[in-house]
């Protein structure tokens, strides 16, 4: 319950009380999207089959509701991502920090998302997952391979109002160890309108 209570407290303290948000969970297959969604929903770690069809979960934490869409990350599932861009409030893009051979593929998909006009003002939280595995990429290494070294906006409370800059930041995490993603969501929550 600690993570849920903490998450609720963060959102409430940042003015997201009684708000609704639509958040897309995107990334290549096996990055941890479904695992994260279930961890946020009921703090359970379960083995999942690859997501074959888009799924959504309504998460209520206190009086805050958000609808999270897990669209799958395999090649065929990526074709429908665009169908979910309308009225999205944030994108959480997961990358398997251990699977360095797929960084180029992940960068290609992320670049397509970042250049899509319908997502031009949408905040992006990039989560480098699986840092609990030895030899997983560091944050700097992941930023470099995703081409984000000079494009992130800062981890603190950065006022971007009127700047025409899209909030975008990288956080490293281990969903199975329940670490790192909370800080990412805290950062993201300040930019959800």
UniProtKB/Swiss-Prot annotation:
Question: What Pfam families does the entry give?
Answer: Arf
Give the organism the record lists.
Brassica campestris (Field mustard)
- Residues forming the motif STAR are 2-4
By its UniProt entry, which PANTHER family does this protein fall under? RE74312P
Q: Does the keyword rRNA processing apply?
A: no
Q: Which SUPFAM superfamilies match?
A: P-loop containing nucleoside triphosphate hydrolases
Q: Which GO terms describe its molecular function?
A: GTP binding; GTPase activity; metal ion binding
Topologically, how does it sit relative to the membrane? Answer: Peripheral membrane protein
Gene of origin?
Answer: SAR1A
Q: Where in the cell is it found?
A: Endoplasmic reticulum membrane; Golgi apparatus, Golgi stack membrane; Cytoplasm, Cytosol
Q: What residues does GTP bind to?
A: 30, 32-35, 129-130, 132, 175
What the entry lists under InterPro entries is as follows: P-loop_NTPase, Small_GTP-bd, Small_GTPase_ARF/SAR, Small_GTPase_SAR1
Q: Which positions are annotated as binding Mg(2+)? A: 29, 70
The annotated modulation of its activity is: Small GTPases activation is mediated by guanine exchange factors (GEF), while inactivation through hydrolysis of the bound GTP is stimulated by GTPase activating proteins (GAP).
- Could you confirm whether the keyword Membrane appears in this record? yes
Subunit-level organization:
Homodimer; upon association with membrane. Part of the coat protein complex II/COPII, composed of SEC23/24 and SEC13/31 heterodimers, that it helps recruit and assemble on endoplasmic reticulum (ER) membranes at ER exit sites.
Protein keywords = Cytoplasm, Endoplasmic reticulum, ER-Golgi transport, Golgi apparatus, GTP-binding, Hydrolase, Magnesium, Membrane, Metal-binding, Nucleotide-binding, Protein transport, Transport
Q: Which reaction does it catalyse?
A: GTP + H2O = GDP + phosphate + H(+)
- Name-wise, this protein is Small COPII coat GTPase SAR1A
So what EC number does this one have?
A: 3.6.5.2
**Similarity comment: family membership:** Belongs to the small GTPase superfamily. SAR1 family.
Which function does this protein serve?
Small GTPase that cycles between an active GTP-bound and an inactive GDP-bound state and mainly functions in vesicle-mediated endoplasmic reticulum (ER) to Golgi transport. The active GTP-bound form inserts into the endoplasmic reticulum membrane where it recruits the remainder of the coat protein complex II/COPII. The coat protein complex II assembling and polymerizing on endoplasmic reticulum membrane is responsible for both the sorting of cargos and the deformation and budding of membranes into vesicles destined to the Golgi.
Give the residues the record marks as binding GDP. Answer: 30-35, 129-130, 132, 175
Tissue-specific expression: Expressed in most tissues.
Q: Name one GO biological process term.
A: regulation of COPII vesicle coating
Extract the ranges annotated as region (Mediates recruitment to ER membranes).
10-14
Instruction: Kindly list the GO CC terms recorded for this protein.
Output: COPII vesicle coat; cytosol; endoplasmic reticulum exit site; endoplasmic reticulum membrane; Golgi cisterna membrane
């Amino acid at each position: 319950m600690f993570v849920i209570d903490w998450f609720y407290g963060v959102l409430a303290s940042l003015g997201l009380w009684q708000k609704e948000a639509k958040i897309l969970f995107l990334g290549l297959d096996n990055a941890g999207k479904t695992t994260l969604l279930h961890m946020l929903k009921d703090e359970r770690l379960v083995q999942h089959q690859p997501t074959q069809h888009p799924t959504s979960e309504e998460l209520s934490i206190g009086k805050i509701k958000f609808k999270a869409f897990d669209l799958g990350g395999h090649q065929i599932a990526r074709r429908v991502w665009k169908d979910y861009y309308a009225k999205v409030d944030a994108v959480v893009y997961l990358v398997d920090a251990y699977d360095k051979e797929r960084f180029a593929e992940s960068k290609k998909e992320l670049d397509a998302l970042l250049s899509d006009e319908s997502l031009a003002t949408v905040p992006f939280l990039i989560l480098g997952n699986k840092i609990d595995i030895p030899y997983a990429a560091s944050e700097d290494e992941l930023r470099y391979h995703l081409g984000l070294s000079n494009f992130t906006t800062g981890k603190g409370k950065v006022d971007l109002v009127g700047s025409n800059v899209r909030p975008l930041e990288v956080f490293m995490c281990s969903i199975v160890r329940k670490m790192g993603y909370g800080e990412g969501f805290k950062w993201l929550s300040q930019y959800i309108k």
